[in-house]
């Protein structure tokens, strides 16, 4: 099935193995419906979890975008969201709709795969994000892995060769959040997120994010601050074109976000 323009609001693709819960990948590339904590949670967001891309031309200009199309929801906001949020305040910041993104967005899906094709006259590449589930016919065990996989295919449409970086930023959604990094057997860095609940508690959880690119590294913690300081600091660092700083905090902090970068 193919979705574009207004039809993008009608599709959310479930990511996750059989019986493991799921995370929704919306038609415009936004992550939503975080139903991986033993309960339904339609419409939920997990902070500023998102995919992003950047490159730099010979003149030094940096092009940075979130890997999303236009936000397809109401520009007025949602009802019953509390003080400073809701109808009349506009879409929630976590939709990333106010960040540089792509004008053209087309979603195609055929389970267990979906594709989002992104293009913009002001960005020197076309991008296809493919997301898929560990669905293997006649192999229930491996099809039940609590995992989702992504590939990012980049087609340079500019007049000069450029190096591209992609980033996956993931918020730790567990109470007593602890972020860390490890080096995998394939020499790739992995971002590990865990909570503070005991292992035998229904509230216990952990997530891991890694990248198979030739050159990878992690920023285990975004800047901790008030208001919108964490996302603003990250975006300033990302859109500068420079390597993200190696920031680390030793103490637990609910809502910490980390990033894995691949080149």
Which residues are covered by each model-predicted region?
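Polysaccharide-binding surfaces and accessory modules of carbohydrate-active proteins
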Residues: 129, 134-243
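Beta-propeller domains with acidic blade repeats across secreted/periplasmic ectodomains
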Residues: 30, 114-118, 157
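Beta-sheet entry/capping signal
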Residues: 10-12, 19-21, 115, 151, ...
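Generic recognition of flexible, low-complexity loop/linker segments
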Residues: 1, 8-11, 102-104, 138-141, ...
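Residues that flank catalytic or metal-binding motifs in active/ligand-binding sites
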Residues: 9, 49, 110-112, 146-150, ...
């Amino acid at each position: 099935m193919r979705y574009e323009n207004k039809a993008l609001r009608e599709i959310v693709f479930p990511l996750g193995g059989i019986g493991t819960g799921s995370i929704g990948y919306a038609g415009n590339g936004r992550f939503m419906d975080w139903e991986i904590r033993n309960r339904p949670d339609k419409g939920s967001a997990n902070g500023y979890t998102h995919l992003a891309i950047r490159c730099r031309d010979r003149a030094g200009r940096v092009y940075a975008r979130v890997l999303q199309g236009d936000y397809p929801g109401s520009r007025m906001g949602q009802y019953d969201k509390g003080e400073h949020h809701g109808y009349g305040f506009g879409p929630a910041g976590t939709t990333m709709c106010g960040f540089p993104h792509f004008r053209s967005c087309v979603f195609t899906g055929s389970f267990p795969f979906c594709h989002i094709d992104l293009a913009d006259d002001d960005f020197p590449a076309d991008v296809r994000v493919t997301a898929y589930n560990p669905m293997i016919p006649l192999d229930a065990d491996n099809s039940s892995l609590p995992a989702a996989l992504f590939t990012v295919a980049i087609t340079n449409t500019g007049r000069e060769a450029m190096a591209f970086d992609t980033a996956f930023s993931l918020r730790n959604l567990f109470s007593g959040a602890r972020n860390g990094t490890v080096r995998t057997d394939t020499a790739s860095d992995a971002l590990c997120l865990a909570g503070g609940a005991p292992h035998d508690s229904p509230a216990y959880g952990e997530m891991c994010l890694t990248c198979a690119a030739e050159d990878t590294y992690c920023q285990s913690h975004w800047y901790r601050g008030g208001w919108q300081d964490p996302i603003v600091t990250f975006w300033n660092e990302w859109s500068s074109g420079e390597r993200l700083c190696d920031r680390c905090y030793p103490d637990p902090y609910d809502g910490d976000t980390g990033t894995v970068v691949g080149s």
